[in-house]
Amino acid sequence: MRRPYLLATAAGLALACSPLIAHAQFAPAGAGGEPSSSVPGPGNASEPTENSPKSQSYFAGPSPYAPQAPGVNAANLPDIESIDPSQVPAMAPQQSANPARGDWVAYGRDDHQTRYSPLSEITPENASKLKVAFVYHTGSYPRPGQVNKWAAETTPIKVGDGLYTCSAMNDIIKLDPATGKQIWRRNVDVKYHSIPYTAACKGVTYFTSSVVPEGQPCHNRLIEGTLDMRLIAVDAETGDFCPNFGHGGQVNLMQGLGESVPGFVSMTAPPPVINGVVVVNHEVLDGQRRWAPSGVIRGYDAESGKFVWAWDVNNSDDHSQPTGNRHYSRGTPNSWATMTGDNEEGLVYVPTGNSAADYYSALRSDAENKVSSAVVAIDVKTGSPRWVFQTAHKDVWDYDIGSQATLMDMPGPDGQTVPALIMPTKRGQTFVLDRRTGKPILPVEERPAPSPGVIPGDPRSPTQPWSVGMPALRVPDLKETDMWGMSPIDQLFCRIKFRRANYVGEFTPPSVDKPWIEYPGYNGGSDWGSMSYDPQSGILIANWNITPMYDQLVTRKKADSLGLMPIDDPNFKPGGGGAEGNGAMDGTPYGIVVTPFWDQYTGMMCNRPPYGMITAIDMKHGQKVLWQHPLGTARANGPWGLPTGLPWEIGTPNNGGSVVTGGGLIFIGAATDNQIRAIDEHTGKVVWSAVLPGGGQANPMTYEANGHQYVAIMAGGHHFMMTPVSDQLVVYALPDAIKQ
């Protein structure tokens, strides 16, 4: 789940807090006594002590409200037929397996999703000379009368002579990578009412066909999932729909999901293609109802668009596509993050979230409890999980995994390399697993959790997993002395707020009688920006948040009085509550009220800065921290939403990730000061920065054109990070490139 944070900083306080920032250190992995003997991973979650209503009729039952709405574009497409997995054609060699030096072929550049480029023209010595090479306007931003839901989050890809991107509303665009001139644009006609919480398109997938001959239309194609649940394939050269993919280039992804309304389910992440199967996940809007549309994961033939298999958690032995009045089981854990494919192992690594109704788990099935907030490795030949590793047991804190897994090789005990997977989490725990088996390569301990909780029939897991072999991306548990403010009165207000809440450290259980403090918060730790990894130096780059939340369950009567209702209720009004943050959680005994842990009068967080950090970890020499610094200045932040203009790096909340290059640089936006930075990979020193026209909440990328290196970032802003929204893709280069 992705939600807003406000940050305010005053000049004097930023200065006063600088010693605190300088001494911010990694916390121990957390208190919690002796490690449990239980094994981390699948199924290690406690079961309810009371019988709870888990009737399978609920999992199969439709929403009591709206039928499939005609406004969902996918509903206008015919259903797609199925084929046997054995009929999927052998996949041609893909450029993402071994990208050309100057290309950025996938969301994370390559099949391993490292976000590393070998390009080295731009270095710490000359980065200060970077200038804007060109700006491209996507034209996608809120129009008069529309609620601002925009947060493009886009990372372009560059293949050969094309720079390919998408607008926040899913139009697919090809640009000249040296000039930014538009070569073609495919309007896919996503409607405003199909936007869920956010209008976002993280990117598109490049695929080379083994069926269509080279030189023919759609031999090279772009595949995209849309906000209104279509899977689209267009020719990479012309932008024309691929006629032999689905129905005229489109597949209806609403097929089998049952009843829904526009904006309830959506795709925002580029789908990976593994051994000829394009794997599709989707976001299900949080906080709505227990029996929301399914979180099913599906595989389609990348050549024809035909259905191949489904992984439906509560019908795990049935991989077929529902027909007639059947549909996938409702309310199951969904996956909204970007997945990672592994052609060698024939697996797709799926970061999962929670079952619908994040903060109440008593109605979840045993199968759901085993796979929520986990990495699930699905065999792309069958649709069956090969292994599951769970990062939070019986999660009621919205610790769904937002990050994409990064693949790398680790040295094994016998001198052989072990194929590894790095999985960041919102908890700030980074798990390093054998990607063949899901077993930890670096130590993981099960530690006692603080309390079973007080919610009837919904006890918490007695233990939780801690990745003790990696530095924890978090600070120590909060204390009352950590509270601060612009004045003694503000600090006193926050101390009183701290005392009024339940808080016993990480995994403080939910409560109804009073609020509880959730730290780490649901924005991380690490979130969807993921990590970047330099395979040459062995340095892993992570940016992360220190932003607690203040949550409270409310009775159904109270939820009704607050006007909380699900999106498919006929009385629901957009912007009237219940879409994110506060949620109805209809079908459970409770609603949920969620706010940042802040002083609502000034808009300042109650915990002292920093609120965002960037860290370099040496993965080749004991997983040690090389350096760690606050990320983000106070220039665009201040009390009551007023910018201070101060350049001090106080560390702001951040969303978006980084790029690391052969030139020894890290490029990152992410922070709420609306800047892009170049940071020396080895020292952490900022060697260049530039103010963006909108928030830099997107992963940047870098590529080469005409012999010169360029750096691109979508400065689209982010409505819930409260950064300026824009439609501008900004591309930088050294002066020699711009003169051409």
From Swiss-Prot:
Q: Which UniProt keywords apply?
A: Oxidoreductase, Secreted, Signal
The leader peptide range reads 1-29
Subcellular localization, as worded in the UniProt entry: Secreted
Q: What GO molecular function terms would the record report?
A: glycerol dehydrogenase (acceptor) activity; quinone binding; quinoprotein glucose dehydrogenase activity
Which residue windows does the record flag with biased composition (Low complexity)? 34-43
Which cysteines are disulphide-bonded? none
On whether Signal is a keyword of this UniProt record, the answer is: yes
Name the residue ranges with Polar residues bias.
46-58
Which terms in the GO cellular component ontology are assigned? extracellular region; membrane
InterPro entries, alphabetically?
Answer: PQQ_b-propeller_rpt (IPR018391), PQQ_mDH (IPR017511), PQQ_rpt_dom (IPR002372), Quinoprotein_ADH-like_sf (IPR011047)
Q: Where is this region: Disordered?
A: 28-105, 442-468
* Family according to the record: Belongs to the bacterial PQQ dehydrogenase family.
Question: This protein is called what?
Answer: Glycerol dehydrogenase large subunit
Please name the source species: Gluconobacter thailandicus
High-level lineage = Bacteria, Pseudomonadati, Pseudomonadota, Alphaproteobacteria, Acetobacterales
Please state the gene responsible for encoding this protein: sldA
